[in-house]
Amino acid sequence: MKYHISSSLFVLFCIVLCACNSSSVEKDGIIQPAFDLIERQIGERAADIQLEEIAPENGKETFEVEAKNGTLTLRGSSSVAICYAFHTYLREACSAMKTWSGEHMELPETWPDFSLKKQTTPYEYRYFLNVCTFGYTTPYWDWERWEKEIDWMALRGVNMPLATVASEAIAERVWLKMGLKEEDLSLIHI
């Protein structure tokens, strides 16, 4: 049962990550996941934000923020870039934030004017988590908690979270191919 839940979470996590990180999908393919995340953060106010896809800069993810006369437009080359643009706008223009331990999301009635011209990351991958993380509370997280963590990562521009799920199954296959017997491996879990 525990293996089934872990496998299901891993597959779902990979699907969400691919949807947020794919550069070869249609426009709605990067816009909808970003919109959904923003809607989870601010509810109906998400409908007041224009989201647009822009081309990567020299193969690197890029974003822009423009707020003028109460209209907020976020542009990005991926869902993660758009989400990071949103996070940047909240932090810089609205003095708002969401963290692991709380939030300050008192948003103004109209979006304050703000302009941040094209920002391009120098990094292809923005990594998060470590091997110890999966030994703490994550095995007991439900989908709501995982979604919160994935949203947190996207808002901060993370596009490569560590996923050690299934490493034991892979190691078992390797050991079996190397000649160990199934009964020898079962002793490991005692």
Please annotate each region the language model reported:
Residues 1-9:
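Bacterial N-terminal signal peptides that target proteins for export
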Residues 10-14:
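Hydrophobic helical h-region of N-terminal Sec-dependent signal peptides
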